[in-house]
Amino acid sequence: MKASELREKTAEQLNEQLLGLLRDQFNLRMQKATGQLGQTHLLSQVKRDIARVKTVLNQQAGK
């Protein structure tokens, strides 16, 4: 996911995407805790995506 793609979305769409990413992060953390997570890189990828969405939301709020 690129920041330029996120900037084209509305705040409502970004909030929906943020909630989905937070759910994904929770599920990945639970899989890691139970030893079921084979692709550990997904945790950091989702974490970065969350940061991107939050950054774009803050930029839009500042305008």
Swiss-Prot record:
Phylogenetic placement of the source organism: Bacteria, Pseudomonadati, Pseudomonadota, Gammaproteobacteria, Pseudomonadales
PANTHER family named among the record's database cross-references: 60S RIBOSOMAL PROTEIN L35/50S RIBOSOMAL PROTEIN L29, LARGE RIBOSOMAL SUBUNIT PROTEIN UL29C
Entry keywords, A to Z: Ribonucleoprotein, Ribosomal protein
GO cellular component terms listed in the entry, alphabetical order: cytosolic large ribosomal subunit
UniProt record similarity statement: Belongs to the universal ribosomal protein uL29 family.
HAMAP family given in the database record: Ribosomal_uL29
Protein name according to UniProt: Large ribosomal subunit protein uL29
Cited PROSITE patterns: RIBOSOMAL_L29 (PS00579)
Keyword Transport annotated: no
Organism encoding this protein: Azotobacter vinelandii (strain DJ / ATCC BAA-1303)
Source organism superkingdom: Bacteria
Matches recorded under InterPro entries: Ribosomal_protein_uL29, Ribosomal_uL29, Ribosomal_uL29_CS, Ribosomal_uL29_sf
GO terms, molecular function: structural constituent of ribosome
Positions of transmembrane segments: none
Gene Ontology biological process: translation
Pfam families in alphabetical order: Ribosomal_L29 (PF00831)
Keyword Ribosomal protein: yes
